Amino acid sequence: MNKRNHIRLPPEVNRLLYVRNLPYKITSDEMYDIFGKFGAIRQIRVGNTPETRGTAFVVYEDIFDAKNACDHLSGFNVCNRYLVVLYYQSNKAFKRVDMDKKQEELNNIKAKYNLKTPEAP
């Protein structure tokens, strides 16, 4: 039986890594050279707009390879820039924005109908 089957990983660990602080001119091939040492990669997307430059997403085939890459490449020096490698958390990225939007909608409804929140006893 494979040893990996018995290892419990933290819930934030997944196959999708978000990489920040990349050199702006880094290519996908260079990213494959750096990240490919840790396992098979399904896809790499390097940011190319003004808002996403210096960032990338790396998708590994295996979650353990992604964990190994995250552990070893966070703080790795590439062209005098230290990489920030994180597990991508889509729910965390949008949860706060979603909550703020819902609160704003609630406040608008209260204002529209002149409602007040009852005070707790």
Curated annotation (Swiss-Prot):
One of its GO terms (molecular function) is mRNA binding. One of its GO terms (cellular component) is precatalytic spliceosome. The keyword RNA-binding applies. Residues 12-25 are annotated as: Interaction with pre-mRNA branch site. The keyword Nucleus applies. CDD domains: RRM_SF3B14. Pfam families: RRM_1 (PF00076). Residues 15-90 form the RRM domain. It comes from the Eukaryota. It is found in: Nucleus. Coiled coil: none annotated. Involved in pre-mRNA splicing as a component of the splicing factor SF3B complex. SF3B complex is required for 'A' complex assembly formed by the stable binding of U2 snRNP to the branchpoint sequence (BPS) in pre-mRNA. Directly contacts the pre-mRNA branch site adenosine for the first catalytic step of splicing. Enters the spliceosome and associates with the pre-mRNA branch site as part of the 17S U2 or, in the case of the minor spliceosome, as part of the 18S U11/U12 snRNP complex, and thus may facilitate the interaction of these snRNP with the branch sites of U2 and U12 respectively. This is Splicing factor 3B subunit 6. It comes from Drosophila melanogaster. The lineage of its organism: Eukaryota, Metazoa, Ecdysozoa, Arthropoda, Hexapoda.
